[in-house]
């Protein structure tokens, strides 16, 4: 996986407000107006966090009238899961070879 893309994905999880947004989106698609009501943050702050989440691929948005609607992207989540899963795969090392040669 591209390291830049991986960094964007995990940056999305590194803020309390973004984690709160993701928890709200677990229940399905939500309008930005609903997110604003539930989070008690300003519209510019929400836009900032949604840009990071959308740029990461974890969240996708669609415009309906004057409002944006957001949902969790199953594709983006799958990429994050595969990366994390890859970190836990046991590495094999040649035990006969010293580690610092």
Question: PLM features: what roles do these ranges have?
Answer:
Residues 29-30, 54, 85-88:
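Residue-level detector of secondary-structure transition/capping positions
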Residues 4-45, 64, 68-76:
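N-terminal helix-turn-helix DNA-binding core of bacterial DNA-binding proteins
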Residues 45-49, 87-89:
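Short alpha-helical linear motifs
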Residues 37, 48, 54-55:
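Alpha-helical residues within the helix-turn-helix
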Residues 1-5, 75-101:
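Amphipathic alpha-helical dimerization/coiled-coil segments
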């Amino acid at each position: 996986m591209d390291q830049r893309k991986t960094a964007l994905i995990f940056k999305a999880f590194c803020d309390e407000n973004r984690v709160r947004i993701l928890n709200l989106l677990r229940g399905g698609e939500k309008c930005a107006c609903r997110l604003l009501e539930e989070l008690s943050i300003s519209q510019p702050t929400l836009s900032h966090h949604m840009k990071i989440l959308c740029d990461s691929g974890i969240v996708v948005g669609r415009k309906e009238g004057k409002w944006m609607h957001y949902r969790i992207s199953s594709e983006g989540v799958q990429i994050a899961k595969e990366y994390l899963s890859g970190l836990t795969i046991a590495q094999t090392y040649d035990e006969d070879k010293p580690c610092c040669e």
